[in-house]
């Protein structure tokens, strides 16, 4: 898979640089950067993941649980547990959470993403 450009996020939402989605909360807690690499395209038990939200969740599982980290990955203080990662996936699966181009970049490539985390 080829590496693609930087994708920026807002409020646990990922958006392409051309279509940034407004944050749904006022207080930003922080952010992290992650490379959604080929290893994030597969679940822990080896089956292929089929959507971008699953892949972002798997990236955080690879970071926190399995210590399989890409060189571009940064730590976060919000998605340490399976339950927290499930919440992240649910948020990202909401309509409008990610643009179509962002989803395609994640599913079909290895983009570098930034996730901004907001309270609420």
Ranges and model annotations:
Residues 27-31, 44, 83-85, 108-112:
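Extracytoplasmic
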Residues 5, 40, 83:
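Solvent-exposed, flexible loop/coil residues
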């Amino acid at each position: 898979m080829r590496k693609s450009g930087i994708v920026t996020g807002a409020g646990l939402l990922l958006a392409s640089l051309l279509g940034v989605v407004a944050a749904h909360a006022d207080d930003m807690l922080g952010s992290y950067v992650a490379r959604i690499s080929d290893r994030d395209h597969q679940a822990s038990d080896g089956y292929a993941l089929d959507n971008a939200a699953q892949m972002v969740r798997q990236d955080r599982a690879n970071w926190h649980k399995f210590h399989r980290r890409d060189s571009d990955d940064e730590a976060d203080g919000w998605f340490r547990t399976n339950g927290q990662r499930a919440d992240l996936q649910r948020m990202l699966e909401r309509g409008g959470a990610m643009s179509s181009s962002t989803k395609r970049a994640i599913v079909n490539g290895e983009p570098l993403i930034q996730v901004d985390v907001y309270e609420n």
